[in-house]
Amino acid sequence: MIITTLTCMCVDIFDNTIMPGGESLNFAATISRLTDAKVYIIGAVGNDSYGKTVLDSIKDFSIDKTHIRTENGDTASNRTYLTPDGDRYYKDDSWNGGVFSSFALSASDRELLHSSDMVHTTFSGPNFNDVISCCREKRFPLSVDFDICRDFDTIEKYLDCISLLFISGDKPTLEKAKRLSAKYTDTVFIVTLGENGSTAFSKGTAYHCAAAEVSEVTDTTGCGDSYQAGFIASYLADGNIETAMSKGSQTAAQTLSFIGGFRY
């Protein structure tokens, strides 16, 4: 089995601490510990010290790195701030996209997508439309993190391609996800609700999972990526939505206990 994720790899810059991160890096590092599948990352880092930090962080992980390119320029970086309760937040000038912003898929990258048993990406990434095009050319299971997107008219345009849809939500999001799940019966909609757990919809049926208990929240960075990794690893193993939600919740709870998106 092949699981491929793309495209964001970056460093998260905290006060006095630089941590490897980005949705794809967090996801790959986490899911590689939960499955025997072959895990690939497609993306790029810059030829700078941050790029070395990213690559060094996953050198001992069971991740295939042949589709990670080192390009001239800056590795993407995100200046990350934490509230006293451990919730992360950003400022207008936090993000530097670096080589991530201009990354383009190669022919080899496209071939990998077509041979994957699950591809996981983000709606906000620069290669999202290319991934959709690849999927329409030759179908593969596709998981997409829509994060806080609320433009459901736009989301609906892509649902013919999406197997698993993750979105951070609220009550109106739940209502729209339920409606769409009855229409797009090949897509499982997973709405994460923070401390209120998560709700999934499949063919109009709702499934709810409470958040796993956490004694103390250190940092919420990478929590969503960990949930998605746990969910997908479990779902690919047995196709059970409720079991997958529970695994996602447990995996996210572990990530809340340390600084950064994954341990290395």
What are these regions (language model features)?
Residues 23, 27, 131, 216:
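Conserved sugar-transfer catalytic core signal across GT-A, GT-B, and GT-C glycosyltransferases
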Residues 7-9, 170, 226:
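Active-site metal-binding loops of divalent metal-dependent hydrolases
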Residues 35, 135, 235:
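Active-site catalytic pocket residues across diverse enzymes, especially alpha/beta-hydrolases
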Residues 178-264:
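Conserved phosphate-binding/catalytic region of the ribokinase-like
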